[in-house]
């Protein structure tokens, strides 16, 4: 028997408890052979001298974790899982609100039950899509229990924000607009102290099994729990598809608990020429049409921490500072404006919009906003035919680039698609 590599696939699921592996809920299409998970146990050498001229007398299994990287054309319906992982502050607004009611009592971060002032089993059924609150703290949940005596439950979507008594509640439909910002609240995902975003299980479906002990695998897949993204790179080249790449750390892999289901995205990648770039002024003004390529890089510091706990896996993979940088290649400049961004240190807004131009369930749109971008490089280049500038910028954290958790942030992504929750 053989296992063709093109029949392998990558699955993702948001974990309800950090480090507890789940079967994938969605498949993330990727470039062939780009998914590179690797278990990285440390081996502790015994090199104590004992009367011989050998160097090593044993390797003792030490602490364990894993790394991963993958990428390819950007699929704007599934990559929200990874944006949520690296940013942590996620608010969502649905469309066509109906069956309006309100909360009968305040809700805390991490809650999975709400009491409503109105509603019925018909208007709030099991599996229904419900929006709680509005503005920066709006969130969408999928009901795991129909309205019963005024109570709804959503065990798969613990609340990310606190909600006041009387906050609005409605049923909603697609499309959904998701806003990703840096999490700054004291309570992180699931109501755990420490401003930590959610973790995910990445599943590598290899179609390879193993019969033996320990580690028998009959699922044909390996799960990488507690996956934390350390870097996300988005690249737009005017002659290519929009591409994205992710990398990070996770716990050591283990056999998936069952054969996973391949839930493939039906969306298509987007050509980069469909993007619009704005520099300075407001988000809707100052369009710049001389940029041939741009890149946005989001980096999150991670620290893998092991403790004396009788387990070789990490105690936690901690998330720290988040930074956003980027490049803008002005391949057709008409003057020295790209140079002036650096020399004058104007630190303008950088705003990118990518819209596939479709409608209904096929409509996909992503925007990125950095309200204060410090241009640190503007190198003149001599292209094949024309003069050009290769610019680099660094984000400056401001109150304009935040979500419902407040504070200061370096930038914000929004996604519009038909995916209700991440």
Predicted regions and their residues:
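Signature of extracytoplasmic/envelope-associated structural regions
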Residues: 1-422
């Amino acid at each position: 028997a053989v296992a063709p590599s093109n029949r392998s696939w990558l699955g993702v699921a948001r974990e309800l408890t950090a480090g507890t592996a789940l079967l994938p809920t969605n498949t993330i299409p990727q470039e062939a052979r780009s998914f590179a998970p690797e278990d990285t146990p440390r081996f502790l050498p015994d090199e104590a001298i004992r009367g011989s001229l050998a160097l090593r007398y044993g390797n003792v299994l030490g602490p364990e974790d894993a790394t991963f990287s993958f990428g390819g054309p950007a699929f704007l319906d599934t990559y929200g899982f990874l944006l949520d992982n690296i940013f942590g502050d996620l608010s969502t607004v649905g469309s066509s609100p109906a069956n309006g009611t309100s909360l009968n009592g305040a809700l805390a971060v991490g809650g999975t039950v709400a009491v409503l002032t109105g509603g019925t089993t018909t208007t709030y059924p099991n599996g229904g899509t419900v929006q709680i609150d509005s503005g920066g703290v709006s969130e969408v949940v999928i009901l795991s229990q129909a309205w019963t005596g005024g109570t709804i439950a959503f065990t798969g979507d613990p609340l990310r924000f606190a909600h006041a008594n009387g906050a609005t509640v409605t049923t909603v439909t697609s499309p959904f607009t998701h806003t990703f910002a840096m999490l700054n609240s004291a309570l992180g995902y699931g109501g755990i102290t420490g401003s930590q975003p959610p973790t995910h299980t990445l599943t590598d479906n290899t179609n390879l099994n193993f019969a033996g002990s320990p580690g028998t695998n009959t699922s044909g897949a390996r799960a990488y729990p507690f996956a934390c993204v350390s870097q996300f790179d988005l690249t737009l080249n005017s002659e290519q598809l929009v591409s994205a790449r992710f990398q990070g750390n996770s716990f050591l892999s283990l056999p998936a608990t069952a054969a996973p289901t391949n839930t493939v995205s039906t969306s298509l990648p987007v050509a980069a020429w469909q993007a619009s770039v704005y520099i300075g002024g407001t988000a809707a003004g100052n369009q710049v049409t001389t940029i041939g390529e741009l890149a946005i890089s989001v980096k999150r510091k991670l620290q893998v921490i092991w403790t004396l706990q009788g387990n070789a896996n990490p105690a936690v993979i901690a998330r720290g500072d988040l930074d956003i940088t980027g490049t803008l290649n002005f391949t057709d400049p008409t003057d020295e404006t790209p140079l002036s961004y650096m020399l004058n240190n104007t630190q303008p807004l950088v705003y990118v919009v990518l819209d596939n131009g479709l409608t209904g369930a096929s409509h996909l749109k992503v925007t990125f906003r950095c309200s204060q971008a410090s241009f640190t490089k503007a190198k003149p280049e001599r292209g094949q035919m024309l003069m050009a500038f290769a610019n680099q910028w660094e984000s400056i954290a401001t109150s304009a680039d935040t979500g419902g958790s407040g504070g200061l942030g370096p930038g914000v992504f929004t996604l519009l698609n038909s995916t209700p929750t991440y």
